Curated annotation (Swiss-Prot):
GO terms for molecular function: zinc ion binding. It comes from Gallus gallus (Chicken). Keywords: Cytoplasm, Metal-binding, Nucleus, Repressor, Translation regulation, Zinc, Zinc-finger. Pfam families: SERF-like_N, zf-met. InterPro entries: MBS1/2-like (IPR045230), SERF-like_N (IPR007513), ZNF706/At2g23090_sf (IPR026939), Znf_C2H2_type (IPR013087). The keyword Ribosomal protein does not apply. Its main location: cytoplasm. Residues 1-13 have a biased composition (Low complexity). This is Zinc finger protein 706.
Amino acid sequence: MARGQQKIQSQQKNAKKQAEQKKKQGHDQKAAAKAALIYTCTVCRTQMPDPKTFKQHFESKHPKTPLPPELADVQA
C-alpha cells in the first residue's frame, strides 16, 4: 500500500515541477509570430511583418497591380 501513496505523491510533485517549468518557459512562439504579421496583401492575402517586406512582396509578386496608398511612401 505504501507504493500507491508514494506514486500519488510523485505524480503531484512531477505535475508541480512541470507547471513551474512551463511558467518559466514564457510565451508561445507560434502566437508571437502570428501577432507580428500585421500587414496583409490585398491581392493574395499573404501576411507580412513590416511595410518594407510588404512593398518588396507587392513589387515582385504583383507588378501590374497599382501600389496601395499605404505603401506609396515606404522605401524598400
